[in-house]
């Protein structure tokens, strides 16, 4: 399926989804939100895809935010619907069951940071700028920013960044736990690709179990998380990949996980 605002390509078991609106700094409009939901659902259903990289076209921005020219025309009910569409799309990424890496160069602001936060890992260029500046427009973050920022960076930092709207650099974002790694701009693609390849070579059942267990524990508490962890652990023992992993360890070789 072709998209108006996205580029989709595969490199082995890694799928790369690129938001391709560089003239708008990859701003999220309703059409792009809908296309992202479709593209990630396709990646979820494709067994050949084991890891996903989410990127923005050009070097100026991952995503500079929502499309303000579109937002300015919305009625209150349309704005609420747009918020829910974005929230549902990002929940779908968070709950995909396959690891998603956000490649952050330039600006990741507003809806862009919200999109990055629903990804499981975030690799940032040293030149990246991150923030939730919605307060300067007279609105609240609408795509989950108030919830995920507090979970990732803590309540105090979330309040500071949302109440002031002041962007931060990649170094501070890393110190807050908001990004996974910070690298020189010229090393960003190599770092992202290496991590994606590492994840794609892992056992898919175990990857999904880890992603789901951490999410469930975070949303429902440690007891629910531990219960799901035990079930996921047991389920792994029904897979050929578990037998391959243990045998490879005993034979001192690299495992070849097939997803079975």
Give the ranges of each region predicted by the language model.
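Conserved CoA-thioester-binding segment of acyl-CoA-metabolizing enzymes
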Residues: 1-55, 77, 91, 189
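Terminal low-complexity tails and localization/encapsulation signals of metabolic enzymes
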Residues: 1-3, 247-260
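A short, glycine- and basic residue-enriched loop/turn
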Residues: 22-25, 60, 65, 71, ...
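Glycine- (often His-adjacent) and acidic-residue-rich active-site loop
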Residues: 56-92, 108, 221
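Crotonase-fold acyl-CoA enzyme core
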Residues: 92-207, 235-239, 243-244, 253, ...
